[in-house]
Each structure stands twice: as C-alpha cells, then as structure tokens.
C-alpha cells in the first residue's frame, strides 16, 4: 500500500516501488463547468455523460439551481440532466451565490449575470477565492455596460452584480485567460449588437466549440483564433454532451510514468484539444516516452489514450504563447524538472501567482523543503535538476494541483513524506489517492 491517511488532512506518502496499469482520469473540469452553464441557459434538456463529480463543478451546479435551473444529482458514473431556462431565464436567488473555491464558476457567472437585466446577484466563495483578482473580468464587462461592485473597486469578492442590457463592441482581454474570454462570450449572447473578443494569446477554446454546438452565432478568426465574434439573437438548444478525461489530471500520471523506475501506464480517454496539449509538447521536448493511441473525436473534442514509459528526461524551457496552453500543468512540470540533469526554465507564468494559491511560491517552498535547487522569479522558476529529493513534511497549502504534484515528487524521494492538506485533490480529482494506491506496486 503506497498511501496511508492518518487524519482528515494528513497523509503518509511512501517512497519507492513501481507504477503500472491503466487509469481513466475524471471528466475535464473546464468542459464540465461549461456543459452545466450552457445547458442551464439553453432551451430544452441537456444530458451530460462523464461530468466531473468534484467540488468545483458542484459549485457551478449549486449556483444554477439557486437561480431556477433544474439539475439532477451529480454522482460518479451517472448521466446528469439539465433542464434549461433559456438565455434570459435565470432568476434572482434568495441568498448569496456561493462559488466555493471555483474561479471558473465566479468568473463565468459574472459574464452571464451582468447581462441579466433587472436582476441583482451577490457572488462570493471561500477564503482562497475571495483573494483572487476579478477586475480582469469586471473591467472588460464594464466596457459593455456592466455594473459590478466589490472590495478594492470590484477586484475581490464578494461581488454585487446589477444586471443590465449590455452593448456589443470590440473588447480586448487583459490576459490570455479562457475564464475571462468565456465570461465575455456569455455576456455577448444577449448584448445589443455584435461583440468581438480579442485575446493577447490563444487560450483554451472549449467555450467556442460548445457554444457553437448549442446554436450560438459565433465565428473564430484572426491570428491563431484570437478574435471571437458573437452575434446575438440566436437561442441555445439543449445538447447531449460527452465529457472527455481531463488532460490536466492526466498530467500527474504522465510525469509519474516517465520518472518512476520501470513504470508503464496507459491513461485512457484523455481530451486532446490543441489548446490544452502544451504539456505533451513539453514532454516531447524532454524526450519522454509517450504514445497517443486510439485517436477519435467525442462531441467535437479530440480524444485519445496515452501510453507512457519510464525513461531519461532532458531539461526544458517554456515561455510565451505555450503558457496559457499548460498553465495548470506548471506545478507538475516543476516536479519533472527536479529529475532532469541540467537547468530548466519557466517564464511568462506570472498568472500562477493568482491561482488557488501563489503556485510559483508554493511549489518553490515545498520542493525546496525536499532538497530541490530552485530560484523563484516574478514570472517563473529556474530549476537545476539532478539533486536527490528527501522525504519530509509537505503541505498542499489547500491547492489541489500542488497536492497531486507533491504526491508524484514523494514517490521519487529518499524516505517517506507526510502531506498536510491532501484532501484538496478532491477539487478536481476525487479518486486520485485511490488510483495512486492501485497503480503503485
């Protein structure tokens, strides 16, 4: 047995051993959020197969239910049924909308609710979410006529939204963020006139793909698809959605598979959307032994199985436009860099400082405690690999991706580790610890 839980928040991680078998990661978190949201504002019934039954999508579902949408209970392995209320059918809730720990929930809701003319909403969340910046969404929405108030001039929740009839136009996003872009696309669905959203770099495009499938009049153009135009007036209609496995969750097994001596894993049914496969490109740059098998398409999203085998890795350097395509995978790439002979560099990644935690600082703290050689910069990390990591006391600092990244690091350390805050993994991967125990030989 590789993992022992001794308390609700503390877990022993045993080093050594092999890693082999087949694993199917949970449904993609980004697609799960959007399927719930778009289904709720469509007309008719939407069914969702493979929806991620984790805390963040549960927060989205709870908010939508509070505004009148009917959503069946969410359980692993069960199809979720959403009865839509139409584009302008969401009602004022009786209480504050609790977005939990989910930045996707609160930011996409801002776009949707800012356009709900004549209704008033208050959005909040847990202590971590209340520290995350919201003006990146609020300011471009204000350019469309939105009225949003909150702490620090609207930058921090709780946020009060007074729904308005918004106006279209050409709106540039301040950062390459799928959350910001998606909020603006939702606002544009009922705006007065067409809206063109322009990103500084291409971010994940699940919203564009899915909104078109639901019937939105949406066109993508410009360099690398950075210009998205929405013409209002089209109703959305319920769809049957199949959610592929989340490549951000698969990333932990991919890195573990190339690092653990003798490892061989197959990760099944992984979404391979080109705006999300930066992790595969970096692992290929590192000469990792990864094959894509059984390529096919599900509900407009490319999908495949990934076979990974252990082998030596070369150091890597990442920056620029690839960062939005692997922003959630930087913590596990930092772990991989610790086991490459040579220096790896991550730059242009300041966005990680405003995730669930400051992930650059947290990963530096935790990996340094294990003996890693890391320099932290304003927008990234320099990691000199090849040092032996030591088992020690670790802390996820409440961040799900940190928790799972440290679990992989602990497998390869000398001596066991103890992880505080291991339950954070449930935000995106409820069965992570069970899968680790099953695969670790």
Curated annotation (Swiss-Prot):
The catalysed reaction is: 3-phosphoshikimate + phosphoenolpyruvate = 5-O-(1-carboxyvinyl)-3-phosphoshikimate + phosphate
Q: Which Pfam families match?
A: EPSP_synthase
GO BP terms, alphabetized: amino acid biosynthetic process; aromatic amino acid family biosynthetic process; chorismate biosynthetic process
**What is the protein's given name?**
3-phosphoshikimate 1-carboxyvinyltransferase
Q: Name one GO cellular component term.
A: cytoplasm
Record lineage: Bacteria, Bacillati, Cyanobacteriota, Cyanophyceae, Synechococcales
User: Which gene produces this protein?
Assistant: aroA
Recall the GO molecular function terms of this protein's record: 3-phosphoshikimate 1-carboxyvinyltransferase activity
By sequence similarity, the record places it as follows: Belongs to the EPSP synthase family.
Write down the superkingdom of origin.
Answer: Bacteria
**Gene3D superfamilies cross-referenced by the UniProt entry:** Enolpyruvate transferase domain
Q: How does it assemble?
A: Monomer.
Q: Which residues bind phosphoenolpyruvate?
A: 29, 103, 132, 179, 359, 401
Supply the alphabetized keyword list. Answer: Amino-acid biosynthesis, Aromatic amino acid biosynthesis, Cytoplasm, Transferase
Q: Which residues form the active site?
A: 328 (proton acceptor)
Q: Where is the sequence biased in composition, kind Polar residues? A: 1-10
The pathway noted for it is: Metabolic intermediate biosynthesis; chorismate biosynthesis; chorismate from D-erythrose 4-phosphate and phosphoenolpyruvate: step 6/7
The record's section on InterPro entries has:
Enolpyruvate_Tfrase_dom, Enolpyruvate_Tfrase_sf, EPSP_synthase, EPSP_synthase_CS, RNA3'P_cycl/enolpyr_Trfase_a/b
Region (Disordered) location: 1-21
Question: SUPFAM superfamilies of this UniProt entry?
Answer: EPT/RTPC-like
